[in-house]
Amino acid sequence: ATETISPARRVVLVGVDGLGPDLVASGVTKGNLPAFARIIKRGAAGPLATLRPTEGPPVWTTILTGRLPRDHGVKSFATYRLLGSATTYELLPKGALVRLLEQVGLVSTRPVTSTARKRRALWNALNAFGIPTGIVRIWGTYPPERVQGFMLSPYFHVLRDDPVRAADTLYPRDLIAEVKSRSVPAGDVDEALLSEFVDPPLRSGGDDRPWRRDLVERALAPDLTYRRAGSLLRAAYDPPFFATYFYGLDVVGHAFLRFAHPESFGDVRAQETRRYGRVLDRYQALLSQWVGEMERQLRPGEILVVVSGYGMEPVPLWRRLLDGATGGSGMSGTHAGAPDGFLMAVGDGVRPGAVLGSASVLDVAPTLLYLIGLPVARDMEGRVLTEIVDEEFAQAHPVTFIPSYESLAITPITAGGSLEDLPPLPEEGP
């Protein structure tokens, strides 16, 4: 058995996507993101280079393993199978042809699940040293693993109304009734909150933009659900490492970027800008507010780390034209070009005003291990971001190494989670 250690620092990890350096800078300058501004001043911050293909599951599996997709095994948002073939493909080219093949049933897709990851994640390493972990909505965690602590998978909000399968999304299952009582269905999103995004008169008939699907069903309702569920579980278990993820900014970035930055598109009507122009800014402000609440709740010996796995940029004109010609999704924001993400850290031992050196998503796992006080695996690809800690922490906690965490016993997944007929999570656009 591995020795049990006390963590050097307790760590809270908040994951988002679609938040790049430019978005942070403009939001801070406009005064729209006061909590982010405070964290950047009191702590460390900087751009985070990302990976290709720039999709949530491979990028976030890299963030939490410190390994490249070719090593950890998660290479896309889904796996694909051609009709009549037993061969599973991990990557297919994105575009109209593949979309057509899916529509006519010649290609089937299967969501990425926890069985796809071939390398140990942070929670495996921490649990091996006796440190409990709390994991909420991280990509690729369905079915959940039998961790020391708890794990709530990103399928909870999809399966919550199924009395049998809802329980399969949480390990251990003890608090599933309480978690379900905290969930927020799309129809229950507060009207006062909605009015901050879209004017009330515009939410009636005649609005030809499917804003309810993108803003309410795919962004706000799930983010509110996991925020409330995460708060409940964290309070119940109080794990030294807690990780949660908010997907909503990525969703609204894909759908509403054109209205926030009409000058980058040229074909946005003034009426549309009035309707939807503040959705993206308001969503960033909401995330900043939530992160600010978590920062204010930090206790001595705790560090808050906010990570965006990639940014968001306008869909190029040629792709918008192709999309229109082939009946595509009409997205206006994309991260197919691997725009930088962002990292912020604040708390006990973080150096105020620190700026990241050349950093990437590969550096997050080694850095989190270091902050917690565990050795960094030499087979991890990234480096420890030592520039974010103050001199006192650095002197008290030199970086230590271990050859690998891959010799750890595999944490079994829960037996109840059925992988057959698993509904897809809302499709992420590249």
Identify the role of each PLM range:
Residues 45-67, 136-146, 245-249, 310-314, ...:
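Short, solvent-exposed turn/loop segments enriched in Gly/Ser/Thr/Pro and often Arg
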Residues 67-270:
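His/Asp/Glu-rich, glycine-adjacent segments
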Residues 15-19:
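Acidic/histidine-rich, surface-exposed loop or edge segments in extracytoplasmic proteins
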Residues 1-9, 78-114, 119-120, 124-129, ...:
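Membrane-interface soluble catalytic domains
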Residues 39, 305-308:
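Active-site neighborhood of phospho(di)ester-bond hydrolases with catalytic His/Asp-centered motifs
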Residues 58-68, 147-156, 319-323, 392-396:
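Charged, often glycine-rich, active-site loop that binds/positions anionic groups
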Residues 22-78, 132-136:
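Short, structured active-site-proximal loop/turn typified by the sulfatase FGly-forming signature C/S-X-P-X-R
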Residues 4-7, 22-24, 216-242, 258-306:
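A long, amphipathic alpha-helix that forms part
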